[in-house]
Amino acid sequence: MEKVKQTIRAPRGTELQTKGWVQEAALRMLMNNLDPEVAEKPEELVVYGGIGRAARNWESYQAIVDSLKTLESDETLLVQSGKPVAIFKSHEDAPRVLLANSNLVPKWANWDHFRELEKKGLMMYGQMTAGSWIYIGTQGILQGTYETFGEAARQHFGGSLKGTLTLTAGLGGMGGAQPLAVTMNGGVVIAIDVDKRSIDRRIEKRYCDMYTESLEEALAVANEYKEKKEPISIGLLGNAAEILPELVKRNITPDLVTDQTSAHDPLNGYIPVGYTLEEAAKLREEDPERYVQLSKESMTKHVEAMLAMQEKGAITFDYGNNIRQVAFDEGLKNAFDFPGFVPAFIRPLFCEGKGPFRWVALSGDPEDIYKTDEVILREFADNEHLCNWIRMARQQVEFQGLPSRICWLGYGERAKFGRIINEMVANGELSAPIVIGRDHLDCGSVASPNRETEAMKDGSDAVADWPILNALINSVNGASWVSVHHGGGVGMGYSLHAGMVIVADGTEAAAKRIERVLTSDPGMGVVRHVDAGYDLAVETAKEKGVNIPMMK
């Protein structure tokens, strides 16, 4: 991948570079994904998650930009793995962009085949929100991480993480949410990363409190704050596959243990034990096969240490990076003895059609987001947990790129919020249109047996029809852009997932599209969990009037 040093920043304000606000939204969100405040390696088009890109290469990026600038409001741009391949006449209510990223026929759905294609310039890895142009920086995963640690606190520690120590690793675009999510729940956290730049970035954006290269200092500070029952987050420079076994050897057992290193990609995401970043980069280039094997061996040691801590009483869970699968494939037969975070903590929310709903102010004016915060506090005042989240986010979350907000809203709530936002754009309360989207990690848009659909009640973990149906219904209902991806979060061969974005531009046509899309999208989550036999989903469907032909 050619590195290009240019600073990309989404335009602000109300002046259009395109032929309509939906096209403008797609253009600005693509550019926002590559804003240096947002992207992990913008010079390589990498947004987050190892090699999760916004476009296949710089030539494709420029062609997408040019296409969006000339796209008519009754045309649809097709993007295949980060490359624009066609513009077809469609209609005004159709999506302006349809994206398919990283999809491979199942027999060939592995990293080796993907890398062959990538080397030939035929494919890119879109992760989840990188290739679908709706990444908003670390805030995008923050509330989900906050909810996860909050539920862990409710189940195991009396409702708060006060006086507890969490140990984790990985402070990239996704994992970087962990320190703040733990301290928001009142706890102490040591978060390990092998890359000083990642820790520095989290400290700069106020997601992490302090930096150290000393395990002794990290433990001393952690114990001091744990005893005081005060929150603090400590970024520790080092390799988790060395530090966790060392803690086991010393008989030090944290209260909570998890991991968000980029273990989904053994070549580009994980650094083997004993290598500096520079040495790892050299080996990756010279002998990728040996690199991958060393990575897998390190991951196995990492998981062995997590299992040892679990045996000693630590609440241990997988945070969706597929590290258990790698260790299992390397011969660690009890790798799955600790659960994934979705079955352990999140699935009840999915049954209610809840998930990581997000919106972005195309104006670039933070005041537009603060006004939408007030809508949440007013319209959902009975949901104290949600309102607490909004108040904390306002105080503690620094915007990256275009101002944005995330909060978990459920079936019925998303459509209600979307209607209000569109009205606020129409009457001038908000200074420009708002982009509404979500992560692919949502209630009805992903099939991922080691993460979102792990341990489904009916054994349907690997059924991948649901994300396809999700993308189809969102497209026909008029989402502004829709994406279908493979391999996000857990790597090649382990997931299929779909994304959608809808633009609130204040028009009556947008109001109708918003009503349809923000009903069917979370509705798919309720439907998927009803089909799998979850009582809470059945209750939700009956209460909300979701039409499911064979529901008992």
Swiss-Prot record:
Q: What is its main location?
A: cytoplasm
Q: Which keywords are on file for this protein?
A: Cytoplasm, Histidine metabolism, Lyase, NAD
Give a single Pfam family match: Urocanase_C
Question: Main EC class of this protein?
Answer: lyase
- Report the cofactor remark: Binds 1 NAD(+) per subunit.
- Asked whether the UniProt record includes Acyltransferase among its keywords, one would answer no
Q: Which GO terms describe its cellular component?
A: cytoplasm
Q: Which domain of life is it from?
A: Bacteria
Active site per UniProt:
C407
Q: What is its EC number?
A: 4.2.1.49
Q: Name one GO biological process term.
A: L-histidine catabolic process to glutamate and formamide
Q: Which GO terms describe its molecular function?
A: urocanate hydratase activity
The family database entries (PROSITE patterns) matched by this protein are listed as: UROCANASE
User: Where is this protein found?
Assistant: Cytoplasm
Any idea which positions bind NAD(+)? 49-50, 127, 173-175, 193, 239-240, 260-264, 270-271, 319, 489
Catalytic activity of the protein: 4-imidazolone-5-propanoate = trans-urocanate + H2O
- Which cofactor is recorded for it? NAD(+)
Q: Which InterPro entries match?
A: Urocanase, Urocanase-like, Urocanase_C, Urocanase_central_sf, Urocanase_CS, Urocanase_N, Urocanase_Rossmann-like, Urocanase_sf
HAMAP family per UniProt: HutU
Q: What does this protein do?
A: Catalyzes the conversion of urocanate to 4-imidazolone-5-propionate.
Family of the protein in this entry: Belongs to the urocanase family.
Protein name as annotated: Urocanate hydratase
Q: Which gene codes for it?
A: hutU
